[in-house]
Amino acid sequence: MDKDLLKIGFIFIAVVSGLIVFSKFSKSSWPAPQQFVACNRIPDFSSYPVSQVYPGKIRSVDLESNTMAKEMSAQILASTGSAVNFGGNYYLVSGNMCGQSCDRHAIIDVKTGQILLYGLDTTGGVEIRRDSHLIKTNPTGRDPTRYYDFKDNKLLYLCEEPK
């Protein structure tokens, strides 16, 4: 009987410890919409231009700059040597880290190798441009299409279109 209680105690401690660790690393640095804001006018990439596109490539990625992103380290490290694909001097990397029909995304500063943002989950991918700081999430898929403005290393939720 005492051994059974001891086993139950260890299991309880393991579960609680796992929940605490999981809650620390599952948080996202991406802003969730505070409330549904319908798009009065659909944002277009040309309305969010960058002044120039950085010509260099990622020399190395600093995984310590965002510890939450370590769960996607293989995909992030594979981006070494990549050129800008978004917002003038950023590289947006995607990985299937959140389920069968879900992708998780991170934004890396190509100049510094720092992981600026991590944890945006989408079911319909993202649409980005090298010369624009607009991010369009879920252009396909079941979830609403959301629009974000990524400027000065900050992400601002703009609006969304229901499906």
Question: Across the structure, where does each feature detected by a protein language model lie?
Answer:
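Positively charged n-region of N-terminal signal peptides that target proteins for export
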Residues: 1-7
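Hydrophobic membrane-insertion alpha-helices, especially the h-region
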Residues: 9-21
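Terminal domain-start segments
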Residues: 20-82
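Surface-exposed loop/turn elements that mediate protein-protein interactions on large endomembrane-trafficking
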Residues: 53-67, 106-118, 146-160
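Structural signature of eukaryotic scaffold interfaces centered on beta-propeller domains
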Residues: 79-85, 127-129
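Acidic/hydrophobic-patterned starts of short beta strands in beta-sheet-rich repeat architectures
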Residues: 89-92, 133-135
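Short glycine/acidic-enriched loop and turn motifs that connect beta-strands
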Residues: 97-100, 141-142
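Short aromatic loop motif centered on NTY/YTY
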Residues: 118-163
